[in-house]
Amino acid sequence: TKGFFMRGGREMDNHFEVMWDTFRDVPSIETPGVSVLDEYYWLNKHDPNYSLCRATVKCGKDAHTDKKFTLDKESAMALSKLFLTTEEELEDKKISDILPDSFWSTNFWLYWQTMFAFQRWSSALEMKRYLCRYVHHIDGLPDFSALRFTKYNQYESMILPLVKYLEAHNVKIEYGMDVKNVIIETVGDKKIAKQIVYVKDGKEQTIDLVEDDLVFITNGCCTDTSCYGDQTHAPDLSKIKNGAGESWDMWKNIAKQAVHGEFGNPDAFCSDVEATNWMSATVETSNEEIIRHIMNICKRDPREGKVTTGGIVTVKDSTENWYLSWTINRQPQFKSQDK
């Protein structure tokens, strides 16, 4: 049986300035006369997000993280040093190269790794960037009180209104295009995109760019080569190969044009699938026994249409193997969901 699926959830906040500056001009498709930003703001003002149980142990018992970071002095000092270390000093280093062994047993690491999908072998430079970008989240990290969520899944609450807005303004959206390369010309100290190379319907084609064109690309995507399964079929992983994927291949072709490595090294991020992949599942149920277990853990009724878990609930005693977390957003999460 096939149902709904979401590869993950977007953890948003009020300081996604670029995104919200965009959506303040995008009309809601549900409430006439207001913007997507208006909807989002009013919803989270009326129904603020926070978690009542951040982690569990022993089959659903509260792990009592109690909003504490449990950082010892050595870990706290190392974390502060990481925040202040220059990016150049962190290149090609793992988090485990920077932080002490005592850090891995702290609540801070439990919160951090499960919220942002970090592993001990993840990039120390990337962790520093996250620390700097979300420093205002630190106080709300233990209970997700810094986060905001949309009413429905992000496709229906954000992407669909944006697509309808663009189409209403005669923007043509091309689907089914596999972008192979962006030809970049170096003029003095400037890098100028001159041409997009893509494949559509098996045929390689190009788009010539002019001075007023803006080009936005995703140079490497963590969901590239995603595979899907359902209730009776496991995902087919046989075609996934280290270093392969449409966005990664494009980045590699762009990187080849660099004179001094200025377009980065994609191989550093996509050469070990086992270290970077993950599995997610979307479950739809009306089973009363399951709902009772959910209510015992998160102290809220998911059928009320309000914040339920308030973010992920991590099964703390699974972190040595599965790193299993689960979440229930406002219901219904999909407009076509059964009541």
What are these regions (language model features)?
Residues 1-29, 36:
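Glycine-rich FAD cofactor-binding loop and adjacent beta-loop-alpha segment at the N-terminus
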Residues 18-25, 111, 157-168:
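Amphipathic alpha-helical segments that form well-ordered structural scaffolds
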Residues 28-136, 148:
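Rossmann-like flavin
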Residues 49-50, 183-184, 223-227, 320, ...:
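Short catalytic/ligand-binding loop motif for oxyanion handling, primarily in non-cytosolic enzymes
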Residues 55-56, 61, 269, 274-339:
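Conserved flavin/dinucleotide-binding core of flavoenzymes
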Residues 111-119, 137-140, 217-222, 339:
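Short loop/turn segments at strand-loop or loop-helix junctions that form parts
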Residues 132-214, 219-220, 232-233, 238-240:
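Helical element adjacent to the flavin cofactor pocket in flavoenzyme catalytic cores
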Residues 199-303:
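Glycine-rich loop(s) and the adjacent beta-strand/alpha-helix scaffold that form part
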